[in-house]
C-alpha cells in the first residue's frame, strides 16, 4: 500500500476507514504538480530582473534542445512589446504605477502565450521558452493557469545575480545595442536602463522554495552558475535542462576545431577506416604545431579520437592530449573503406536513400548523423564546461559540433563545409558564436559532397518511413542495431524486404545483390517452415498411439 493511502492503525478493524488528514494534503500536493500527460509539451518560463542573462540562457538552451532533436522555440516578450509600442521613450514605461503601460504589457504577454499554444498545437513544438522578466506572482499565476487550461507542463528558470560587474558587463555588451536605444550615447543608455531595473525591483517577488512556490518545478541559477537550487523536477526533459544549465558558463574562452591531416584513405577517396597520414597530412600537423605556438594559448586542452589519423596529428604538436572514442568518425557499417562510386555500384538503393535524407539515413550496420549527434552530446557538455580547447576530429563529427555552435538544423548539418587543413576558431559571444576560419596553406584533397539537386522518384520509400535496409548485411549475424529513423515514426504501410523480387516477373534481367540476398533469405525461410510443418505432423501421429509424456508435452509446446 502506498504512503498516500495509509490508514490509521486504531481504525483498522472498523468498517469505515478514514485516511489521515496529513496524507490527504500530501496526496493533493502531489497531484497539483504532476503533469496531465507524460508527453505533454513543456513551457519554460524565465524569471529575473533585466540584465541577468535571461535571453542568453533562453537562446543557448533553445540551441541545445534543437540540436538534440527536441523542437524548441523562444518567445521573447520584448519583441511583442516593440510591436505594440513602436517608439520607446524612457524607463517610465516600466513603472508599476503606469496603468496604461501595465495594460499593454499584460496584453503582450497574453498574445505571446497564444502564440505558444499555436506552436504546440499547430507546429508540433515540444518546448517553448517564454523569455520575459515574469517577476511578480500575479504574472506567474497567470502563466500557470494558462498552462493548466491547455495541459502544458511548466518549468521555471530564475536567474539571480547581485554581482555589479556582471550586470554592468551585460548592459554594455547587449543592452547598449538594443532596439530600445537607437542612436543614443552609451552614458544615457546606462542611466536609463539602470532606472528601468529599479522599476522592476519595486515589485520583484523571487521564487519562494520554502512556502509559496514549493510545489512548482524550477531551477534557480545564482550569479551565473556559482550556485543552483533545483526544485521538483518532473520528467526526463526537465532533468536534461537542469543538467545543461549546470554545465554552461560565461567566462571568455576559445574553441578550435579542425580535422586530422590528410590521410591515405582521403587520397584514395575512401570513407571510414583507420589509415595513417599522407605526406601532406604530416605537413599540416607541423603547420598546426607552429600555429599553436604563435597563438600562445593559455591552458589549452587537446582532444582527439581513437583513430590513427587524429592521434598522429596530435603527436606532432608535442603537447599532452586526450583520446575520446566518442570523437571517432561516423560508422559507415558495410560501406567502411569504400569509395562513393563503389557504394553506388554495390548498394545503389542505399546510395540513393542516403542522398534522399542524409541526416536520418543510417548505414547498414553503422550510424546516422542523428546517432552521431546523440553520441557527441557528452562532448558538447564538456566543451561548455571547459576553457580553451582544440578538438582534432573528423568530417562528420566536426559537422555535428559546428551545427551546435552555429545553430544549424538537421537539413544543413550533413552538408556543412569542413575542409581538411582548415581551423575553425569559435568564440562564444552574448547571443551566439563568432566564427573565424584559419588556413594553414597546406594543400589537401576535397572530401565534400554537395547536396544532390535531382528529384527522387515518388515510388521510393522515404528514409524517415523506412525501418530497415534492403541491403543484406555483411555477416550472418541477424542481431543488429534496429534502424528506426525517428522516434514514434512508424511506416504508413508494411515494408517488404523482398520488394526487389517483384522486378523479376516478366523481365529477363540479371539479379542484383539485393535480389540475390532476398532470394536466399526466402529459400532459407521456406526450408525452415517445411521442417517445422513436418515435425508437427510426426508429433500428431505419435500422439494418437501413446499418452504424451512430459518431454513430448514440452516439445509440442
Swiss-Prot record:
Residues that bear N-acetylserine: 2
UniProt keyword terms in alphabetical order: Acetylation, ATP-binding, Hydrolase, Kinase, Multifunctional enzyme, Nucleotide-binding, Phosphoprotein, Transferase
Gene3D superfamilies: P-loop containing nucleotide triphosphate hydrolases, Phosphoglycerate mutase-like
Regulation: Phosphorylation results in the activation of the kinase activity.
Post-translational modification (record): Phosphorylation by AMPK stimulates activity.
Biased composition regions of type Low complexity, renumbered to the chain: 1-16
Biased composition regions of type Polar residues, renumbered to the chain: 456-479
Lineage top rank: taxon: Eukaryota
Sequence segments annotated as region (6-phosphofructo-2-kinase): 2-251
Region (Fructose-2,6-bisphosphatase): 252-557
One GO term describing the cellular component: cytosol
Modified residues (Phosphothreonine): 471, 478
Binding site for beta-D-fructose 2,6-bisphosphate: 259, 266, 272, 340, 354, 358, 369, 395, 399
Binding site residues for ATP: 48-56, 170-175, 351-354, 395-399, 431
Role according to the record: Synthesis and degradation of fructose 2,6-bisphosphate.
Similarity remark: In the C-terminal section; belongs to the phosphoglycerate mutase family.
Name of the protein: 6-phosphofructo-2-kinase/fructose-2,6-bisphosphatase 2
Amino acid at each position: 500500500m502506498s504512503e498516500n493511502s495509509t490508514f490509521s492503525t486504531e481504525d483498522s478493524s472498523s468498517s469505515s476507514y478514514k485516511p489521515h488528514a496529513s496524507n490527504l494534503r500530501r496526496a493533493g500536493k502531489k497531484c497539483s504538480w504532476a503533469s496531465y500527460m507524460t508527453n505533454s509539451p513543456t513551457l519554460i518560463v524565465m524569471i529575473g530582473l533585466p540584465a541577468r542573462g535571461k535571453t542568453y540562457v533562453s537562446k543557448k538552451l533553445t540551441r541545445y534542445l534543437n540540436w538534440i532533436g527536441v523542437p524548441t522555440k523562444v518567445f521573447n516578450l520584448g519583441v511583442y512589446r516593440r510591436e505594440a509600442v513602436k517608439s520607446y521613450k524612457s524607463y517610465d514605461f516600466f513603472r508599476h504605477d503606469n496603468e496604461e503601460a501595465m495594460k499593454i504589457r499584460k496584453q503582450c504577454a497574453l498574445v505571446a502565450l497564444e502564440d505558444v499554444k499555436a506552436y504546440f498545437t499547430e507546429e508540433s513544438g515540444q518546448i517553448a521558452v517564454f523569455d520575459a522578466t515574469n517577476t511578480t506572482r500575479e504574472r506567474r499565476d497567470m502563466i500557470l493557469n494558462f498552462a493548466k487550461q491547455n495541459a502544458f507542463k511548466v518549468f521555471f528558470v530564475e536567474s539571480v545575480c547581485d554581482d555589479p560587474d556582471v550586470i554592468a558587463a551585460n548592459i554594455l555588451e547587449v543592452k547598449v545595442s538594443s532596439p530600445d536605444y537607437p542612436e543614443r550615447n552609451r552614458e544615457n543608455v546606462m542611466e536609463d536602463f539602470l532606472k528601468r531595473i529599479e522599476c522592476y525591483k519595486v515589485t520583484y517577488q523571487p521564487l519562494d522554495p520554502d512556502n509559496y512556490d514549493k510545489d512548482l518545478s524550477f531551477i534557480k541559477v545564482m550569479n551565473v552558475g556559482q550556485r543552483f537550487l533545483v526544485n521538483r523536477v518532473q520528467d526526463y526533459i526537465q532533468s536534461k535542462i537542469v543538467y545543461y544549465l549546470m554545465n554552461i558558463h560565461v567566462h571568455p574562452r576559445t574553441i578550435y576545431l579542425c580535422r586530422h591531416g590528410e590521410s591515405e584513405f582521403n587520397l584514395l577517396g575512401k570513407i571510414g577506416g583507420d589509415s595513417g597520414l599522407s605526406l601532406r597530412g604530416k605537413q599540416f600537423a607541423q603547420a598546426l604545431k607552429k600555429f599553436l605556438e604563435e597563438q600562445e594559448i593559455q591552458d589549452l586542452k587537446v582532444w582527439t579520437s581513437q583513430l590513427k589519423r587524429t592521434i598522429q596529428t596530435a603527436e606532432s604538436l608535442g603537447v599532452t592530449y586526450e583520446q575520446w572514442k566518442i570523437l571517432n568518425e561516423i560508422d559507415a557499417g558495410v560501406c567502411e573503406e569504400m569509395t562513393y562510386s563503389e557504394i553506388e555500384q554495390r548498394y545503389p538503393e542505399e546510395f540513393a536513400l542516403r542522398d534522399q535524407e542524409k541526416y536520418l539515413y543510417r548505414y547498414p550496420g553503422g550510424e546516422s548523423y542523428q546517432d552521431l549527434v546523440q553520441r557527441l552530446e557528452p562532448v558538447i557538455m564538456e566543451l561548455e564546461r571547459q576553457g580553451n580547447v582544440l578538438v582534432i576530429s573528423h568530417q562528420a563529427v566536426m559537422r555535428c559540433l559546428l551545427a551546435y555552435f552555429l545553430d544549424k538544423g538537421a537539413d544543413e548539418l550533413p552538408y556543412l563545409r569542413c575542409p581538411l587543413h582548415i581551423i575553425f576558431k569559435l568564440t562564444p559571444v552574448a547571443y551566439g558564436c563568432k566564427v573565424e576560419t584559419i588556413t594553414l596553406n597546406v594543400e589537401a584533397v576535397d572530401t565534400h559532397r554537395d547536396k544532390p539537386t535531382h528529384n527522387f522518384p515518388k515510388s521510393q520509400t522515404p528514409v524517415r518511413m523506412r525501418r530497415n535496409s534492403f541491403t543484406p548485411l555483411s555477416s550472418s549475424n541477424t542481431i543488429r542495431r534496429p534502424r528506426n529513423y525517428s522516434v514514434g515514426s512508424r511506416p504508413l504501410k508494411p515494408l517488404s524486404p523482398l520488394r526487389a523480387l517483384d522486378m523479376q516477373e516478366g523481365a529477363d534481367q540479371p539479379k542484383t545483390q539485393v535480389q540475390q540476398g532476398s532470394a536466399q533469405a526466402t529459400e532459407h525461410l521456406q526450408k525452415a517452415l517445411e521442417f517445422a510443418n513436418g515435425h508437427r505432423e510426426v508429433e500428431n501421429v505419435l500422439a494418437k498411439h501413446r499418452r504424451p509424456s512430459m518431454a513430448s508435452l514440452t516439445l509440442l509446446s
